Amino acid sequence: MAANPRAAAVAALVRQEQDGFSNLVLDAELKRQQLEGRDKAFASAIFYTVLEHRGTLDYILCQFLPKGLAKLDAPVREILRAALAQARYMQVPVSAAVNEAVKLTRAFKKSSASGLVNAVLRKACSYDLSTASFKNEVERLMVLGSAGQDVAEFLHKNYPDEALDILTYKADGGMTSLRANPLKTSAEELCTKLLASGAKEAKRGIVPGSVLARFEGSPAENELFRQGYFHVEGQASQLAALCVDAQPGETVIDLCAAPGGKTILLAEQMHSTGRLYSCDAAENRVGLIRTAVQRMGLANVEALCNDATKVNPALPQADRILADVPCSGLGILAKKPDLRYKKLEPAREAELLATQSAILDTAAQLLKAGGRLVYSTCTIDPAENQQQIAAFLARHPEFTVVEPAAALPAGMTAGEHGALSVPTRTGMDGFFLCAMQKNGEKLQ
């Protein structure tokens, strides 16, 4: 099959439905088909548009498929989704979307389905979703918000008035969040440099030092990225690192650090002095940290493979610790659309909560008296956030919740057990952080 962005997107979608890990399967397919430039961007746009809107796409397609989508061969199913996504969300003319879809049935050796694809798409592309009726609010969220049943039920239970807006929120306004390297430039100067180097748009973000930019392709293809003028990091993640308030000359540990964005910010706060231990449990992800640190020219970072659920004797007592723990990811549905369809199984949730709890206990042992611990997640699940902190404080009365070192954006307020960002309230990712101090003389 000749290199074709639509074919690449469909092939990646087939793999994603089988294996998950959306970014990995897409990257592998783009490399296999050797797509570059606009073709690569177009294939990526189709892929992520389908994932983001799959619930809506499937609902519409099923209006014209009496036996449903599940009975179709996987390539045919993804061809239908991809074509409808192009026509409905990507400003591709209906005729082009349909004709190319029919061609793809032949390319994937499914030519017997070409008539069905043609007929279903011509009806589906003109379907008026406003005429749809739903059994209940959860089904409405699943269709209009493109979510699986578990995620829809979670949002309906915990955020009933904001659920649909959370599902349809565009992360950072659809722009890419960056962090300027203060060793080379300021956020204001970076905006100017980005526009001069081909970015379509660049402006200051909500979090101090952050920049929001829109690129033609990947930010990693920009020369300023290769030269270490910025790294890609969500605004909420930047805020967590800022709240650590790392100081020059200190000993700091980033317990769950890969791919390294928060480590970079911590090292910059320390003016590349002191010692910063950047840890991850997977050796291949530690390699990502080392690559990021080298690109930014930071000299005070030691990246190491480490299980954060256990105390490693090789790690010293630290002045400050950041524990950005593994979580359900329910705050970043806009950035990782495959999470919309995840199963929220009680056994897995219990295992995740136990892991978070163990990491907090490790941090408690590694932190010096008077030191600061920042716990953060990219979820809006109270069990992983406020309830996790309440349980930690009950186990560790030597800790006290303190005011975050960085100013919180509008809409994000600190409570008894931490501060929560809900996308609809802050314009950032869904996110939680809690700054705590260990009893003893406060760090200066």
What are these regions (language model features)?
Residues 1-444:
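S-adenosylmethionine
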